[in-house]
Amino acid sequence: MMSKKNYEALGLIETFGIVFVLEAADAMCKAADVELIGFENVASGYISVLVTGDVGACRTAVDAGVKAVNDMGAEVYSSVVIARPHEDLEKITRRYTFDKLLPTTED
């Protein structure tokens, strides 16, 4: 779950294919002080990646992610930075978290 400290903004990029999403996520995390929340396979290969942090960091991260995808010759379907998101958005973004996406192992 997102910490209240980092809930100042959300940054999202949606593109086609896991390779491009990984490149975007890597560029986003390297470009700014953001927390990678997770990803979601939206439909038919379109995948969104989500970060959170302060507004400036999310803008920098999204710009870097979009550039990284474009530099690989792919297209970004959509991107957005949501400043001061309403706390109820966590009901949606909660599904992006890695603990919801990855299988758990029992000891």
Region locations from a protein language model:
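Long, contiguous binding/interaction regions
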Residues: 1-46, 52-107
